[in-house]
């Protein structure tokens, strides 16, 4: 309500000032919106123009890039090729080009090739291979075509560049002006609507001023609602504009991608069509040249210089000039009147081309053909290449299509093509190219009648079109990108596919025309991409980014508008709705808070009083009773904590800490905590951490300790007399590659499927841990891991009774045990493993196990931890640094017949900076050379490897070599359990300097080594402990609790450290005691108290301190009046049984400095207060 009153007062006092400044304030966003819109439009326009210019430049250089990429030829090399020809050759080629018509490319190419002398061709040859297998003459045939092509790109670049600039500039200017006009209209509309809203608001203000004061709250709500409405309208328009811009960007970019794809397809298709057409025409020129050769040397000379053998040999040796042809043949023109004479000269009859069943001649034996029927003219084949030698004597005029082809060829004087037909053997479609061979006396400008009369024969060449196209296109770099089809389109009603397949995206294709030199036949090349258009991520990504930014900015502005426009009534409604939605959760939280407080508060009194009772003068029996009661109370507290943890996990309220901690220190604590129970049963407890595990990791140390404690506690509980419990920690990456494992312990554990006696810590068989690792996804996952995180694999192995097979499926179910007798025999509630598994899952890990009844169980889990910074240090371990410095560089010898146990001992020594060698027996130690035994600081012998007779030999060796040794090593015996009497007896023999009781841990080793090696030097930790005991001496501490027992427990614990304790029973009394000035140095505050709880009392105390500090700072009062303190802040720590995280957060929010949960120990109380005082 106070917030509402302040808002109403501010509105009534500044209504006129606000209304007068609204107009000026409004003009600023409108102007800013117009300016931003204009800048965005201009920026987008220039970006697009720049990209268009780059695209124009890239497209202009496209042909040059394609030529270089596919033929490895640059523009300068083409110019060099042209410059190789002499001026006369170039002039001749240009004249040929000028005289020829557009359809006569082949003819003038041949003429140019013939005009170049053979000797010049040899001297001007260029090793420039286009991948087509042509000779130098074929290169010269194309010389007349290169220069016109090279003269065009520069002009085309300039024209295309100017045209692209003009079109792009006009298009984007037009779009920009339209957007700007639209933005101005929208801004004007907003301004008009706001003017109306402002007028209405002024009228409402005048009416509200006349109303009674009781309606001020309603007026403030209405004004605020109206003031926020127009802001939401502008925000909505802005979001719509951003969405529209995102959609437009996607559409424009996608269209551009499609256009580029089409242009790429067109360029690639045109390039292939041009290559195919050019090479076909080059081959056509060679066939034409062959026809001229036949005319010159067969008909022009008497006798003829060519026969079948010569023709066959010549065509075979010059076949490299016609790599695209399947074969060539020459047919002689024979009139009917000369048929008999012709047949007598050649010794064979002219055969008919087609048989009665219309089978193609290539598929039949010529001897089986019928004689050619009587007709005016015949065209029998007299010369043929070896590949088509079977058609000799066949009349080419007897075939309908070949007859038409021959007639067109001799009438036009050009090469003509047949329609596609299937070739022999290959079953491919092919065509036949026919040239008429004329008499050498035929003039160049002969008429059609003259050409028919001068015809003396016909030269034909067959082409296998699929092989031809495949041969020409296989050298192109992007051959696999597009699919190419070649069609004969002479008959538009029925296209004939000469080459191609059905693969590819037929929805988008490009058609390029082909000119094979026959104007009466039409051919086309159809190209398409083999794959469909991929997802346009280039268009989607920026569009989504713009959309996300739009919504993010819109959300931020919307939240800001809501914060401005929200009134207390709306907040209250939201709180009510939220309270209804979370009613069940609040009830559960209240239940947990009440139960934990009601149970833990009396437990605090029970444990506190028992502890105080044990500090009194009790006899042995009374002390035993008090210790038993205290232990049972702690067990009950642990049970309560487990139940509360399970409830918090189920409700999803459990959160993990993220602080640096030393995992080895945690494992030492757990082994120290549980070593007593393990030693009572004679169980060997061992801990090993891989050297690859960092010294400090980031995570939740308390929850990690809880998991280890649960697993090890269960192992101790279910392990009978003797045996072992082995805790090992490795990086999960170490087990990914079993063949590359370097860690000695891990390698031995993976060596056998089920560990043998000699391969375990105690010698008792244990199940192999591999069974619990192999199903972990996190261990063998191939996903990349963050560089600042590590995955740890923790294994707890025991030699207990094992888990029955039928009970293994429900082992992680809460409140479930193997059978009903388990709880009666071993105790427990069955929720420890369930809690541990859920905690592991919160650590992004997995938990599993493998167990065999009668052998034991192995539990393993993984967890993700953070890597600590290199300079991170743990305060708890700093007290060991000095001791480690004393031991660094020492050498030790470990004698143990168990390899894994010896590695555990070496691991503990390595933590102290001591290097150790391992031997398996005392006999092997005796056989070691003197150099290995020299400079040893200590020898550690496991009790299982101890043999008095063998050790006497080793002791004698030390005695004889005492001169060579700088010092005699100390002897330590490592035992799982030993009474004080047994330890004294062992040391009295003089062979052993000290007996170390396992489990080995840093603190125990430091203590033993310091007492033995440094001759009883006092340990640094004890000195530090005694110094810390003076921190609370003479300190004034206030304890606030409504429970008398709790006050007495806290008072007794603090008085032991010399503190002066004052107790009060309520928050009001504490408020009076803590009102400055006062003499208290710290305060323990209970949270749940009648009249005034701890939260309210702390808030009141902080308010009083702030007021006093403010007055002292401003000089209103002097510091001498308040005990010369310039700033008052008494440390207040909460005492409560409520352990829910929400309560802890509330304590910090109200101004408390710390948190102590009940029941608490003396150490807990002392540590909580001591951190606020400087050591003396």
UniProtKB/Swiss-Prot annotation:
Gene Ontology process terms (BP): cellular response to abscisic acid stimulus; cellular response to cold; cytokinin-activated signaling pathway; negative regulation of iron ion transport; phloem or xylem histogenesis; regulation of chlorophyll catabolic process; regulation of flower development; regulation of meristem development
Free-text activity regulation comment from the record: Activated by cytokinins to initiate phosphorelay signaling.
UniProt main location, coarse: endoplasmic reticulum
Membrane-protein topology: Multi-pass membrane protein
Keyword line: Cytokinin signaling pathway, Developmental protein, Endoplasmic reticulum, Kinase, Membrane, Phosphoprotein, Transferase, Transmembrane, Transmembrane helix
Description of post-translational modifications: Autophosphorylated predominantly on His residues. Activation probably requires a transfer of a phosphate group between a His in the transmitter domain and an Asp of the receiver domain.
The protein, known as: Histidine kinase 2
Gene this protein is translated from: AHK2
SMART domains, per the entry: CHASE, HATPase_c, HisKA, REC
Domain of life: Eukaryota
Reaction(s) catalysed by this chain's protein: ATP + protein L-histidine = ADP + protein N-phospho-L-histidine
Lineage: Eukaryota, Viridiplantae, Streptophyta, Embryophyta, Tracheophyta
Protein species of origin: Arabidopsis thaliana
Subcellular location, record wording: Endoplasmic reticulum membrane
